[in-house]
Amino acid sequence: MAARVLLARGGLLRPAAQSAFLPGLRTVTSSSHRAREDSWLKSLFVRKVDPRKDAHSNLLAKKETSSLYKLQFHNVKPECLDAYNKICQEVLPKIHEGKQYPCTLVGTWNTWYGEQDQAVHLWRYEGGYPALTEVMNKLKENQEFVNFRKARSDMLLSRKNQLLLEFSFWNEPVPRPGPNIYELRSYQLRPGTMIEWGNYWARAIRFRQDSNEAIGGFFSQIGQLYMVDHLWAYRDLQTREDIRNAAWHKHGWEELVYYTVPLIQEMESRIMIPLKTSPLQ
């Protein structure tokens, strides 16, 4: 969401130039611009982080559910992608449907734009960490899954995962019919800014729900910390462009973007295509 107000140089985030240099960028009065510029610079160099009274998981996550999410990234050998997809579509739905496993396959995709030959899987564990441990222990005794993992390991270049909680102000991801493309926008936040990010996005999310594009919003608990992942669905790339542009015509969106930009260290966008067995189509 920060693309309109950022220019990247040497990996450092900075505010975009005045509209005289970028035609079409919204203009503000010089006094207002100077005030915002001063505020923005102060947020970079003299930011004061207020002490927290509780953990992020207690302040930002949903209280009515103890669900835990696992996000997996598998980088596949290019010549093995079709075979990898085939065995995933054979085995993963059985875990999803198995009553003995307290977990749900939220979605499974191949990255279309972004890192190539990559598979992305999102799981939900109803019951938190105990459910995750239960599933792991039961799968160790599942010979079909053991064989699947062995075959899969020969197809992979690398893999990583994260354990996530869901922001309280996002809806829980639910299956949806297709066809859709999906965008996973990942933000590496500056340490100490997660609460502020949550506060801003609790207001910003209302600007991004008119077309039912918001799937889920998550923050990391284990893995790469201070990571935020937002998952969106669109009919196609042009629809994505139209929906994102429309947000800029809504009063309040630009200001929320402006104040979330300084919280970001890095950001990445993946456009993903669901596999045939993905609950999110």
UniProtKB/Swiss-Prot annotation:
Transmembrane segments: none annotated. GO terms for molecular function: protein-macromolecule adaptor activity. Its main location: mitochondrion. It is found in: Mitochondrion matrix; Cytoplasm. GO terms for cellular component: cytoplasm; mitochondrial matrix; mitochondrial outer membrane; mitochondrion. One of its GO terms (biological process) is positive regulation of high voltage-gated calcium channel activity. Keywords: Autophagy, Cytoplasm, Mitochondrion, Transit peptide. Residues 1-27 form a transit peptide. Belongs to the NipSnap family. Protein involved in mitophagy by facilitating recruitment of the autophagy machinery required for clearance of damaged mitochondria. Accumulates on the mitochondria surface in response to mitochondrial depolarization and acts as a 'eat me' signal by recruiting proteins involved in selective autophagy, such as autophagy receptors (CALCOCO2/NDP52, NBR1, SQSTM1/p62, TAX1BP1 and WDFY3/ALFY) and ATG8 family proteins (MAP1LC3A, MAP1LC3B, MAP1LC3C, GABARAP, GABARAPL1 and GABARAPL2). May act as a positive regulator of L-type calcium channels. Interacts with CALCOCO2/NDP52, NBR1, SQSTM1/p62, TAX1BP1 and WDFY3/ALFY. Interacts with ATG8 family proteins (MAP1LC3A, MAP1LC3B, MAP1LC3C, GABARAP, GABARAPL1 and GABARAPL2). Interacts with VDAC1. This is Protein NipSnap homolog 2. It comes from Mus musculus (Mouse).
